[in-house]
Amino acid sequence: MDCALALVARGRPVREVCFVLGVSRSHMTALRTRKADWVDRRKAPPRPDDDQLLSDIITVAKDLPTYGYRRVWAILKFQGIDGSPRMVNHKRVYRVMRDNNLLLFRHGSKPRDTRRHDGKVAVQTSNTRWCSDGFELACDNGEKVRVAFALDCCDREVMSWVATTKGIDAGLVGDLMMQAVEYRFGAGSTAQTPIEWLSDNGSCYTAIETRTFAKQLGLKPVRTPVESPQSNGMAESFVKTFKRDYARLANRPDSQTVMRELKLWFEHYNEKHPHSALGYLPPRRFREKQRSIN
């Protein structure tokens, strides 16, 4: 800009100089007509004090060390510390965590999964499709706890779960389905309209007793293609989240301890776990929002 001003002062045309040097003509005119005693009184906005925010972030990170900056931000915004939500921008949370080395370690790019699934498991309304799957948790003493759960494919709430140190059989899956139906519609009730019950091809799900009982409850059994676990991707994703954010961080000395902790873990997931697909709201808060809109 100084070069452009010098050329114009020597008599060069303003339009020609601005075009050749690529500067703004309006800016050039403003500088040429500015008074000699002009003082730039513009000031940068005051930088917010990050000490309290950093303290709140550390408090969240201590309890939930697997949460990235987005979920930390969601906890602060929607739940807050001691129940007091904090209005803060997610970019500011990222900056504070970055400057204080609190961001999670970024893993390298994962190899592309060749087991592609082009279908869509998620649905727009609750009680349209439920998915179910099971997983295993190993204890320090060698015992294993096997867990099965029922998850709504819209609001992501875990409606029911069962656990055992033995295998998941048709009887336990029947209990799982009945608990889910009674949780959503009341004791002794059945689904008002058929609800898809999505599962894999495990023997406990394909058993005649399971399919018959599901239909009695108003559920419509739907199974994934053989050797296609990605077709039940929502349940698979939940298992990954549950193990990463809860099971791996906890002491698991024996099966009795794990059985006691499972209830707390599922409750925390439903009440407080921010979900990206739900606008970073926990499942139950998302359901409350749904009901208020409808």
Predicted regions and their residues:
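Charged DNA-binding/catalytic regions of mobile-element recombinases
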Residues: 1-294
